[in-house]
């Protein structure tokens, strides 16, 4: 029997997030970004014969190998991601993303950069050349949670037939336009709903969902302040 599991949660932008676990990022064998919790991660739930088990397009053996490599050499967990953004015209900007540092080396797996277009809709004086920045935040949040669910479901031998997210965020432009010091410029709240179809027991899906929330890098970024250093120079 397939179960449709649907839930949602508000992103608490000012509250305390998960701090009693240890979040780390990927290893050389995976070259992808994921999280490990010291109270029980992928290594604790591995099932298979060690011959390259794949579930949801995820090589579970490589996943477990990444975790074990990080346990043996914690420096492999240190990643640094980069982006370069240039103004095009009006509210239109173009971001290039390619290289990054991770697993102790500069990654060169991407032959060409990803190009992300950013703009505003006409009502905000843009030309719809791309989603605006705050919409991209919603996309990043859902993308990160997708990785967390799919990877951890594979490690727990939970089969996922379908997975989707719906997101909404509320902004009051009084903050962005400098019309009120009492209104924050960013999202006042975010609502996210997750719908997942799986034949796993509901309690297993709820346990997976709670774990992914605790270990999601982007959800942590949204819920908790991140130190940001800003510099500007004359070009």
Predicted regions and their residues:
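Extended beta-strand/beta-hairpin segments
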Residues: 31-36, 43-139, 149-235
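Short hydrophobic targeting helices and cationic amphipathic motifs
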Residues: 10-13
């Amino acid at each position: 029997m397939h179960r449709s599991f649907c839930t949602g949660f508000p992103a608490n932008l000012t509250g305390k997030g998960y701090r009693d676990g240890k979040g780390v990022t990927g290893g050389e064998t995976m070259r992808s970004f994921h999280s490990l919790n010291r109270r029980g991660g992928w290594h604790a739930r591995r099932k298979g014969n060690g011959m390259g088990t794949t579930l949801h397009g995820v090589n579970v053996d490589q996943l477990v190998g990444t975790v074990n490599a990080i346990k043996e050499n914690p420096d492999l967990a240190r990643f640094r991601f980069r982006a370069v953004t240039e103004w095009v015209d009006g509210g239109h900007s173009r971001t290039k993303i390619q290289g990054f540092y991770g697993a102790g080396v500069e990654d060169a797996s991407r032959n060409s950069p990803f190009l992300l277009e950013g703009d505003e809709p006409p009502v905000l004086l843009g030309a719809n050349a791309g989603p605006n920045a705050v919409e991209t935040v919603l996309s990043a949040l859902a993308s990160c949670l997708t990785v967390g669910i799919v990877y951890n479901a594979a490690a727990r031998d939970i089969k996922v037939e379908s997975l989707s997210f719906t997101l909404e965020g509320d902004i009051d432009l009084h903050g962005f336009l400098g019309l009120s010091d009492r209104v924050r410029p960013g999202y006042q709240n975010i609502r996210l709903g997750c719908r997942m179809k799986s034949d796993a027991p509901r309690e297993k899906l709820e346990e997976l969902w709670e774990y992914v929330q605790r270990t999601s890098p982007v959800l942590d970024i949204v819920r908790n302040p991140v130190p940001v250093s800003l510099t500007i120079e004359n070009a």
